[in-house]
Curated annotation (Swiss-Prot):
The chain crosses the membrane at residues 22-42, 57-77. Its main location: plastid. The lineage of its organism: Eukaryota, Viridiplantae, Streptophyta, Embryophyta, Tracheophyta. This is Photosystem I assembly protein Ycf4. One of its GO terms (biological process) is photosynthesis. GO terms for cellular component: chloroplast thylakoid membrane; photosystem I. The keyword Iron does not apply. The gene is ycf4. Belongs to the Ycf4 family. It is a multi-pass membrane protein. Keywords: Chloroplast, Membrane, Photosynthesis, Plastid, Thylakoid, Transmembrane, Transmembrane helix. It is found in: Plastid, Chloroplast thylakoid membrane. Seems to be required for the assembly of the photosystem I complex. It comes from the Eukaryota.
Length: 184
């Protein structure tokens, strides 16, 4: 949901707080917890989970491997939960024709570069570019070519826009910024 007036266009960017990330984090957490409990129950020789009798799983080597997978899965799951809680990748793109400035803001991982803030003059924008890669994993990305800076992506690579939606978005942005469109 973008906010747009005659002179200012603000485009919010979704970060890590997507439904798919929540689903993967929950599935990974529950699966790795299950692996860890099965490995622990094979070590203790008692049934911590009633689905698998501990006598059928020998601790060496199956129990050790399942415990390792459980611990590794918990680490990956905690990484996913941290990116979700920090909302990594979220932010906004602000195009201000009145002041002639484009601001791109994104949240990153905690640390020195937690806030990523880029600022350009509109007169330095050469074009709005659509890059299309067809095939099994088709991908369409919208870029902004900045003189002396190169191309800056404006859409995420995991956003699946239809060709019409991507063309519409590029045309609206190019019209707003008064720059040409390039397609690669």
């Amino acid at each position: 949901m973008s906010c747009r007036s005659e002179h200012i266009w603000i485009e919010p960017i979704t970060g890590a707080r997507k439904t798919s990330n929540f689903c993967w984090a929950v599935i990974l957490f529950l699966g790795s917890l299950g692996f860890l409990l099965v490995g622990t129950s094979s070590y203790l020789g008692r049934n911590l989970i009633s689905l698998f009798p501990s006598q059928e799983i020998v601790f060496f080597p199956q129990g050790i491997v399942m415990s390792f997978y459980g611990i590794a899965g918990l680490f990956i799951s905690s990484y996913l939960w941290c990116t979700i809680s920090w909302n990594v990748g979220s932010g906004y793109d602000r195009f201000d024709r009145k002041d002639g400035i484009v601001c791109i803001f994104r949240w990153g991982f905690p640390g020195k570069n937690r806030r990523v803030f880029l600022q350009f003059l509109i007169k330095d924008i050469q074009s709005v570019r659509i890059e299309v890669k067809e095939g099994i994993y088709a991908r369409r990305v919208l870029y902004m070519d900045i003189r002396g800076q190169g191309a800056i992506p404006l859409t995420r690579t995991d956003e699946n826009f239809t060709p019409r939606e991507m063309e519409q978005k590029a045309a609206e942005l190019a019209y707003f910024l008064r720059v040409p469109i390039e397609v690669f």
